[in-house]
Amino acid sequence: ELILLSAAGILFIIQLIYYFGLYNRIHARNKAVRKEEVHFSRELPPLSVILCARNEAENLRKILPAILEQDYPQFEVIVINDASTDETEDILGMMEEKYPHLYHSFTPDSARYISHKKLALTLGIKASKHDWLVFTETNCMPASKDWLRLMARNFTSQTQVVLGYSGYDRTKGWLHKRV
């Protein structure tokens, strides 16, 4: 019985070492990819970045410069104002003067019997000039100025969808405790 318990303990320790080693390799690789400079030799397709905003004035003030100043040859940013009651419209107008590749529109207040988010996305898609569309949220900050390049490097003629993710930053507050 003692031999079986010892063998199980040894196997458990070996398994833990394996999992920690595997996790550390994945973590180190992801860290290296984030730090490396991105250089691409092939031509990058023009992109349309689409955001929907409903009362997101503070987030737009932070995220739009990070998106609009991406190191990418040709792209446009389309923000659909979804019936905001805060300063969203003012911020979009001010930033549109500074950034010529920023465009914005709005969803009508009278829209009923349809999801406002779906309507806003549809309007953004219809307003886009380019075939490749990138969707993001107003609370997802790009990790670097190469964010669009990193997304576009996976585009091929056979590609239909490229997915990315945004890590979750834990902050204080009751809402974040629930997540």
PLM regions: where:
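N-terminal membrane-anchoring/stem segments of glycan-assembly enzymes
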Residues: 1-40
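Short, well-formed alpha-helical segments that are part of the catalytic scaffolds
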Residues: 28-34, 56-69
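Short alpha-helix within the catalytic core of nucleotide-sugar-dependent glycosyltransferases
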Residues: 64-65, 89-90, 130, 144-156
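Short aromatic/hydrophobic "clamp" motif used to bind/position activated sugar donors
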Residues: 121, 133
